[in-house]
């Protein structure tokens, strides 16, 4: 059951941004050919639900999945509605991947059903650039409602599937999501001197409608929300391509 007071406050806040005129694209590319070439829409559909989960219940993988979503939202236009169940988001961390605090509207839900209802309300509004939520349980019927709301509002929906205390794969249950992603931390980029380099992630496209899965080792989002292929991998790929042409 959704919380009427939260929905009412959200509607009041959204009325303050009505009337914005934004140019809508059909898809948001990653700008990485290896990923965009695999995605059925040559990018993430901007009128669809996409699910993300950390590879484990650990804090590192959970943070990586959160920042992966924040980077996507940073590259979309306009305000972002972020619906939470717990107050563990670190706004300066979101800003480091390009999602400024001034763009984010926060809503706190009392349970997963409340969270999904608030997300649906935001998706239908049409003046938001992205709607993000975090839930442990979102069944096929609930995700189908989110997908229909995303299509109707032409707004991207990003749902972080958190690990349940009982264990299991958060992406194992049936879902109407167009894409499903699993994010894991990886050893950071090596530096020529002592220090910590740019974070790296193992990004796995577990499933997508109309396309194949895939997995990539990437450098984490920069201040513009963009991931990158590590330089060493680019050089090795270029060298391999040259050898193939010579053969």
Question: Would you name each region that the model predicts?
Answer:
Residues 44-45, 123-125, 151, 173, ...:
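Solvent-exposed alpha-helices and their adjacent loops that cap or buttress functional pockets
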């Amino acid at each position: 059951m959704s919380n009427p007071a939260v929905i009412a406050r959200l509607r009041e806040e959204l009325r303050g941004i009505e009337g914005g005129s934004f140019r809508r694209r059909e898809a948001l590319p990653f700008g990485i050919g290896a990923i965009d070439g695999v995605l059925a829409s040559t990018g993430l559909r901007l009128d669809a639900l996409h699910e993300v989960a950390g590879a484990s219940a650990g804090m590192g993988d959970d943070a990586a999945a959160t920042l992966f979503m924040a980077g996507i939202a940073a590259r979309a236009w306009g305000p972002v509605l972020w619906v939470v169940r717990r107050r563990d988001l670190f706004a300066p961390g979101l800003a480091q991947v390009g999602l400024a605090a001034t763009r984010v509207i926060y809503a706190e839900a009392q349970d997963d059903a409340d969270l999904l209802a608030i997300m649906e309300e935001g998706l239908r509004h049409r003046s938001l650039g992205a709607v993000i939520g975090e839930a442990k349980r979102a069944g096929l019927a609930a995700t189908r409602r989110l997908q229909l709301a995303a299509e109707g509002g032409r707004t991207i929906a990003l749902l972080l599937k958190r690990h349940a205390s009982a264990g299991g794969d958060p992406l194992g249950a049936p879902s109407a999501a167009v894409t499903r992603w699993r994010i894991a931390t990886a050893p950071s980029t090596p530096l020529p001197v002592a220090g910590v380099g740019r974070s790296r992630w193992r990004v796995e496209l577990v499933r997508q409608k109309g396309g194949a899965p895939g997995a990539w080792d990437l450098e984490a989002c920069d201040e513009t929300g963009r991931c990158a292929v590590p330089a060493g991998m680019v050089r090795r790929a270029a060298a391999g391509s040259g050898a193939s042409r010579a053969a």
